[in-house]
């Protein structure tokens, strides 16, 4: 079962997601409220809405950053290439009709390297296009046990626009990519063992491979003393190796979220926000 603390940790990266400008404090801290409507899993027709107080944390160090929809450590950087350690996660799924009689899905935590290649960057750094190649190991845990559930690879194109649509201070991020998952990952989310098979839910297993596509748009603005932002994401599992799983009830999912945070403290040291 997901505790409030766990949910807050999952939403930290969203609340700190798009705080970008030319010069910003080394760190910022505050508190806010976030709301998001999230499917139980990709391909599920059941959604959960989370409305929770969340911490607002941003750190823009040379080696470790908490921003840009993720917590990541930078191990290597040139003008064209960065090598990061990225983290991600997803909430649990319980009381799902398609999985009735099957074990609930625990929250997952993802971590692994990401190779980021800058394809274009305007001279004023207000427009950036990059290819991101993250490969993350996935574990599931209810904090009483830990289960390894495979790997996920999500190559994507990411476009960041500062002062979007000629509106000063508004930052827009657009991302589109593919999803690939291994056999263990697909077994965790989409397999039906014979013991759980029913007349309406036949046994199913899938190997690893193509797992669909995703498109994300996020917008935010930092005002004096507070921050606002929102996002919308579309996912498709059309053509995925697990598309025919009886646990897949829809081929398309939409995820939306919104957050507002009040910034109570900030570093006097200013640094350039490179993302």
Model-derived regions, located:
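Short loop/turn motifs that connect adjacent beta-strands in outer-membrane beta-barrel proteins
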Residues: 21-27, 42-43, 62-81, 120-129, ...
């Amino acid at each position: 079962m997901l505790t409030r603390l766990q949910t807050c940790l999952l939403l930290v990266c969203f609340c700190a997601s798009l705080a970008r400008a030319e010069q910003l404090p080394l760190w910022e801290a505050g508190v806010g409220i976030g709301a998001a409507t999230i499917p139980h899993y990709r391909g599920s027709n059941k959604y959960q809405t989370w409305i929770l107080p969340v911490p607002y944390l941003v750190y823009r160090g040379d080696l470790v950053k908490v921003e840009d929809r993720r917590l990541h450590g930078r191990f290597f950087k040139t003008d064209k290439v960065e090598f990061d350690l990225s983290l991600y996660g997803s909430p649990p799924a319980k009381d799902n009709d398609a999985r009735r009689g099957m074990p609930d899905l625990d929250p997952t935590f993802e971590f692994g390297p990401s190779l980021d290649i800058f394809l274009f960057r305007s001279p004023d750094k207000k427009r950036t296009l990059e290819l991101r190649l993250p490969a993350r190991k996935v574990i599931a845990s209810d904090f009483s046990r830990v289960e390894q559930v495979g790997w996920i690879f999500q190559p994507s194109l990411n476009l960041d626009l500062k002062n979007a649509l000629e509106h000063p201070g508004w930052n827009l991020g657009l991302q589109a990519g593919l999803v690939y998952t291994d056999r263990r990952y697909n077994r965790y989310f989409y397999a039906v063992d014979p013991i759980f098979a029913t007349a309406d839910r036949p046994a199913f297993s899938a190997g690893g491979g193509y797992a669909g596509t995703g498109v994300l748009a996020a917008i935010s603005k930092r005002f004096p003393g507070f921050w606002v932002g929102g996002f919308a994401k579309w996912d498709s599992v059309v053509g995925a190796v697990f598309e025919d799983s009886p646990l897949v009830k829809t081929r398309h999912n939409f995820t939306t979220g919104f957050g507002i945070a009040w910034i109570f403290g900030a570093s006097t040291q200013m640094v350039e926000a490179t993302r």
